[in-house]
Amino acid sequence: MTSKHIKQFVTVSLFIFLFVQCKTMKENRQDIKQFKSIYLDQFKLTYTRRLLQIGFNNSTSINNILDTDPRGFTERILSDADYHLIDSLVYQDNQIMITDSTNRIGMVAEGAEGKSVLDYLISKYESKWIDSVAKVRYKTLGVKKFE
């Protein structure tokens, strides 16, 4: 081979390598974004389901409703540590609701006494608190960013 052919071969090889590598990085970026979206959704959904269950004292009716929800889990995304964190958060939230309920006895109409699970859950969502917790937890996974 002449030096001209070697240069052409090296140039073409580098071009192909760089083209394939860039495409792979782009696909990785898309996969990471998709995984992040799925992870955050699963974290928030799990928190919501657990808060409803615990907030309504593991009511059979609530569990039946949650069991019929078509948005079930297809594969395990969250780790055991994630579930432990969610259970801890839900436990704390339930304690807050119980304390609030106890403090409201005699101060609100009879029908308004008790835990306000849906009010509490809506206020958590509106504050974006669970979003920020899920994002912080996602960052601890160490998923590499390609930007």
Summary of predicted features, one role per range:
Residues 18-21:
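C-terminal motif of bacterial Sec signal peptides marking the signal peptidase cleavage site
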Residues 23-26:
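Bacterial signal peptide processing site
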Residues 39-43, 56-59, 80, 111-115:
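Soluble non-cytosolic domains of exported or imported proteins
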Residues 30-49:
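Post-signal peptide N-terminal segment of mature Sec-exported envelope proteins
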Residues 2-10:
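Bacterial N-terminal signal peptides that target proteins for export
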Residues 45-68:
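Post-signal-peptide N-terminal segment of Sec-exported extracytoplasmic proteins
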Residues 65-147:
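Compact alpha-helical subdomains of small soluble proteins
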